[in-house]
Amino acid sequence: MSPKIIEQLAPKGVLRVAINLSNFLLVTDRSAGGNPAGVSPDMAAEVARRLGVGIEYVEYKTPGEIADDAGMDAWDIANIGAEPQRAEKIDFTRAYCEIQATYLVPPGSPLKSIEEVDRPCVRNGGCKTNT
């Protein structure tokens, strides 16, 4: 690994990884040592291994909190969804996967497909804790 890349990704000699604890698809449990466990921590550990540096998990309750700390020297890499507002402060890589999701509608709703939901004048929302 190039020393320049190591310096860019782990300038303090350890890879500080922001971990979004609210996404149960990416962080599923805790290791015996108490660290976050799951896809996101595993990917971060592999990045640290390839860089040849140690890892430090910086835990956050929401991805919004991670984004808020961008530029504050609190973390080196993170695994959160790319959004235009976040991209003003964060450089994103290509997506490594696509997470399948769906809509819930009340009984009797006339909305039967994504195309009917994803159009002007149709209001929809999400969980506030995932902002």
Language model region names:
Residues 1-81:
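Extracytoplasmic small-molecule ligand-binding "clamshell" domains
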Residues 6, 39-40, 87-101:
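A structural signal for short loop-to-beta-strand junctions that line the ligand-binding cleft
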Residues 14-21, 37, 115-131:
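Short loop->beta-strand "edge-of-pocket" segments that line small-molecule binding or catalytic clefts
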Residues 16, 102-104:
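Residues embedded in well-ordered beta-strands
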Residues 20-24, 82-85, 97, 106-109, ...:
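Solvent-exposed coil/turn segments that connect beta secondary-structure elements
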Residues 30-33, 70, 91-95, 118:
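Short, glycine/charged-enriched secondary-structure capping and boundary segments
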Residues 65-67, 88, 113:
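Short acidic active-site motifs
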Residues 96, 105-124:
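Flexible hinge/capping segments at coil-to-helix
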